[in-house]
């Protein structure tokens, strides 16, 4: 993980979306040292993908780009349909015989918040993206499947995108099947505040929901940093405050220092209001 760094900006960010290795000979070597169960039964190998707005650290020595910090308090969520967990979603994109996976959160009748670098894996075709809200594992999707319809990238540099999905086979909207998450106005968000990042890390069995617990260490502009640990596949995970409101969308981190999300400040909130008619910001 020490070479082939991109030079778009001065800070190196470890990408936290899981995707398929195109170089299969290299992929086989990487995958052998990791938990194969998180890749499903097809032995699909994974690597990070490039974000359109951040320096991404290419995965060289491990399949799942990760920023594991001293605070590695991660635990599995089994009651995925309960409370605010219901809106947390597993994102799946088939790519070149394999797949990419990430995370997101339902925030409107038809809308999911995630990262640009996650939806970019669909190569411009949102119908390649499947969303499974409150997924329990690769064989148990209690709230079914929704297919992407439209991608709306945030106009700024921040790694944020809205994914609009079509109704399911029963003509139900995703925001009818699960209760959309509440967005925090962030007027009270502070340093040292307790937070959680909840999503679908790639080092765990496929499509299992995990929560990481930590504290805010920095707030500035459209960036929120924290001291908790994350792994590839967590990209797009919602960052929840103590009221279970979304204060950010996780995208990456810096080795041995911190993890980061897009902070939902006033500019981001206006973007959400402009594109999600029923967005709930409190």
Curated annotation (Swiss-Prot):
It comes from Staphylococcus epidermidis (strain ATCC 12228 / FDA PCI 1200). Residues 28-66 form a propeptide. The lineage of its organism: Bacteria, Bacillati, Bacillota, Bacilli, Bacillales. The keyword Secreted applies. It catalyses: Preferential cleavage: Glu-|-Xaa, Asp-|-Xaa. It is found in: Secreted. Exhibits a significant hydrolytic activity for the carbonyl side of glutamic acid. Shows activity toward human fibronectin and type 1 collagen. This is Glutamyl endopeptidase. Transmembrane segments: none annotated. Its main location: secreted. Keywords: Hydrolase, Protease, Secreted, Serine protease, Signal, Virulence, Zymogen. InterPro entries: Glutamyl_endopeptidase, Peptidase_S1_PA, Peptidase_S1_PA_chymotrypsin, Peptidase_S1B, Peptidase_S1B_tx, V8_ser_AS. GO terms for cellular component: extracellular region. Monomer. SUPFAM superfamilies: Trypsin-like serine proteases.
């Amino acid at each position: 993980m020490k070479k082939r760094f991109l030079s778009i900006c001065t800070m190196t960010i470890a990408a936290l979306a899981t995707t398929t290795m195109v170089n299969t000979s290299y992929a086989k070597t990487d995958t052998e040292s990791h938990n194969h169960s998180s890749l499903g039964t097809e032995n699909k190998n994974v690597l990070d993908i490039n974000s359109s707005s951040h320096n991404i650290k290419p995965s060289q020595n491990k399949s799942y780009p990760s920023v594991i910090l001293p605070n590695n308090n991660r635990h599995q969520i089994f009651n995925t349909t309960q409370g605010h967990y219901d809106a947390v979603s597993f994102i799946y994109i088939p790519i070149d015989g394999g797949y990419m996976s990430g995370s997101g959160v339902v925030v409107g009748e038809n809308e999911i918040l995630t990262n640009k670098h996650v939806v970019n894996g669909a190569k411009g075709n949102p119908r390649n993206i499947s969303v499974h809200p409150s997924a329990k594992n690769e064989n148990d999707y209690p709230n079914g499947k929704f297919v992407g319809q439209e991608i709306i990238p945030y106009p700024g540099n921040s790694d944020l995108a809205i994914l609009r999905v079509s109704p399911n086979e029963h003509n139900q909207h995703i925001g009818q099947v699960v209760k959309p998450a509440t967005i925090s106005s962030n007027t009270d968000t502070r340093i040292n505040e307790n937070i959680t990042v909840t999503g679908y890390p790639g080092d765990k069995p496929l499509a299992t929901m995990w929560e990481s617990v930590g504290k805010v260490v920095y707030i500035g502009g459209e960036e929120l940093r924290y001291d908790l640990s994350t792994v590839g596949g967590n990209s797009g995970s919602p960052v929840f405050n103590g009221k279970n409101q979304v204060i950010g969308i996780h995208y990456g981190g810096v080795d041995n220092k911190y993890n980061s999300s897009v902070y939902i400040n006033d500019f981001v909130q206006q973007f959400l209001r402009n594109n999600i008619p029923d967005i709930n910001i409190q």
